Amino acid sequence: GVTTADLVVVGAGLSGLWTAVRAKQRRPELDVVLLEGGRIGQSASGRNGGFVAASITHGHPNGIERWPAEFATLQAMGVENLRGIEKTIADYGIDCDYQRSGELQVATEPYQIAHLQEHVELARAHGAEVEFWDAERTRGAVASPLYQGAVHDPEVGIVDPARLCWGLARVAEELGVRIHEHSPAQSLQPSGAGMSVSTYSGRVET
């Protein structure tokens, strides 16, 4: 059949689910439809290691090397994003085993210590709240005699990604989002002043 919506979101992975939720949070009056070709969170969003990091530059050294002038802003944006994830999980009671675990980048050889210390000095100078841990403190967190030291990044968590997806879907529906699983988008075409999204079994007009 044919239905209408103010906003159509394609894909019920984490990006699509969060887009739909944020749209309804900001504009509750919007009629939002979310189309998913399979099941909610069945692909990469629900089948990953569950690491939730504030870094949006694939690590501090990489970000500083590529975008030195913008890194502090990028780091602040990443931290704000992590806080937003945590707030959404807490505010809506999403049961997804989220833990602010932190992350350790460890040294297993003495010569690696200087590199880790340089990492910390450089990252902190650009706004990242990381710490160098000596061998004793590192082994207190992870009982292995191999570890000579570590960089500790507190802005990292871990989550059950599938349960996060299912929880976000529940929140989206509670906010009024209409979710259609097994409805892969086949085409996107202009339609009057809006757009038309077609699936195998119907069409959504905006």
Report the location of each language-model feature.
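Helical element adjacent to the flavin cofactor pocket in flavoenzyme catalytic cores
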Residues: 114, 121-126, 148-206
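Gly/Ala-rich phosphate-binding loop of Rossmann-like dinucleotide-binding domains
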Residues: 20, 24, 171-173
